Amino acid sequence: MIAKDKIRVRLFSFDVKILDQSAESIVKAVQKAKAQIKGPIPLPTKIKKYTVLRSPHVNKKSREQFEMRTHKRLIDILEPTSALMDSLMKLELPAGVEVDIKQ
């Protein structure tokens, strides 16, 4: 069996609403180009926690915790065309969304 060409698009963001909007715009662009698509598949959210002292001098027991959540989505595009790649490169995504494209 011959392996088909596919492009894997991974999206990262701290804001899940912006991430879903970006994934939806990519899906619409791929469907407009009549290519097959798998996704968006939600990947596990990475949570990074930071613990800091509330006071700079005393009260070691008084601490505060902060967390950063990194949400991820995965989109597979099967058998992409050059026209599809051009439309994906011209696609305007909101600030705060990181896009990683691999073949």
Swiss-Prot record:
Pfam families: Ribosomal_S10. The gene is rpsJ. Involved in the binding of tRNA to the ribosomes. This is Small ribosomal subunit protein uS10. Keywords: Ribonucleoprotein, Ribosomal protein. The keyword Ribosomal protein applies. SUPFAM superfamilies: Ribosomal protein S10 (SSF54999). GO terms for molecular function: structural constituent of ribosome; tRNA binding. Belongs to the universal ribosomal protein uS10 family. InterPro entries: Ribosomal_uS10 (IPR001848), Ribosomal_uS10_dom (IPR027486), Ribosomal_uS10_dom_sf (IPR036838). GO terms for cellular component: ribonucleoprotein complex; ribosome. The keyword Aminoacyl-tRNA synthetase does not apply. Part of the 30S ribosomal subunit. One of its GO terms (biological process) is translation.
